[in-house]
Amino acid sequence: MVQDVDILWFRNPFERMSVAAHMVTSSDFFFGDPYSPMNLPNTGFLYAKSSRRTVGAFEAWRRARESFPGKHEQQVLNEIKVELVSTRGLRIQFLDTDHNAGFCNNTRDFNTLYTMHANCCVGLGAKLHDLGNLLREWRAYRSMDEGERSRGPVRWKVPGICIH
């Protein structure tokens, strides 16, 4: 399990992960099928099951960096994910953005939110500002009674630097 430091956990994201997946990654953009390589990965949240298959996939991923000079590891994974799935049989689960959101695709409902990643946000100050506001809103949400929460989506009200 590897994750960026700009991710808030509101609930346990392992509840959303399939035991059948060899690798699980968050998504910048999610298109409905958790196993479709058409989803765009965000390796800020990455889990890999220990196996020969995943070790081979990580080795291929590392070697592939030479074929894509100037691209960072997430961009390289995006380039080779179809090959990893079709040729190596790697089962990659892309976490849906309704439950594991980011600033790119702000789900805005605390009732369904597991994690929030400060992606699509430039600068540590901006990330800390918006994540701090979000954490304050989460605390207010947690202080609500169950009846208030069950009336529908509980949305946060923070206009931020990166969250709009």
Regions found by a protein language model. Give the residues of each.
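GT-A fold catalytic core of metal-dependent nucleotide-sugar glycosyltransferases
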Residues: 1-40, 45-51, 55
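Catalytic core and acceptor-binding pocket of nucleotide-sugar-dependent glycosyltransferases
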Residues: 48-164
